Amino acid sequence: MDDTYIKCILQKVESGEQSAAEAFEQLKVLPYEDLGYAKIDQHRNLRTGQTEVIFGQGKTPEQIAGIVTNMRKTNARVLITRAGEDAFAAVQRVDSSAEYRKQARIILVGGLPDESERTGRVAVVTAGTSDIPVAEEAAVSAEFFGLYVDRIFDVGVAGIHRLFDRLAVIRRADVVIVVAGMEGALASVVGGLVDAPVIAVPTSVGYGASFGGLSALLAMLNSCANGIGVMNIDNGYGAACLASKICSKQRKNRDENNANE
């Protein structure tokens, strides 16, 4: 839900298209609606600029479908992360607009924002092909939040010349998300080459001493390159959220400056 939804209800009451009693029924579920197994945060977009997203892991397909049905009453689009094909089948039964991005393990309901809603551009860069599932979680989530996405995959430090060939594309981004496992060195390299904020995402890819992504996480936290923020292991979605907030704030500031000129 966003402020447009509430304004629309109030305008309908003002114009006589809707009664006060009908408006009350719609508004009384705010700021959240209790489904028993889930409490839907209807005001999250109003507070934070980002709608609530469903974390699919640990939820049954029926629970996910029920949450989607409820959220679609007040949200044009819904995103479900860490979702399997059984969850997708359940969601598709209640909403035919659902689509499944298998590599990202994401279900999209209601499509993606149109051009007028785009707030910025993000480059999603991976060290290796094995990092792509986490990168796709970041990329699809970023598209859901209204960002243009450039995907640059398999440009890790073992063949650094591959990165240099794509540097022009990376440098045009407002935010760069770097996804890397093993020793996680790519984030530091990119951080030393671009002027945009870098969001580093360590992945659990690697052999024994990578400790399921801990080595990459610690390497990224200890980076000597400036302007790098680090997400939790395999958290591509979190990187997209942060990138979206950065871009949305930049656009809001630009719009305000233009209005004051």
Role assignments for model-derived ranges:
Residues 94-96, 193-194, 224-226:
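Short, structured coil segments at secondary-structure junctions
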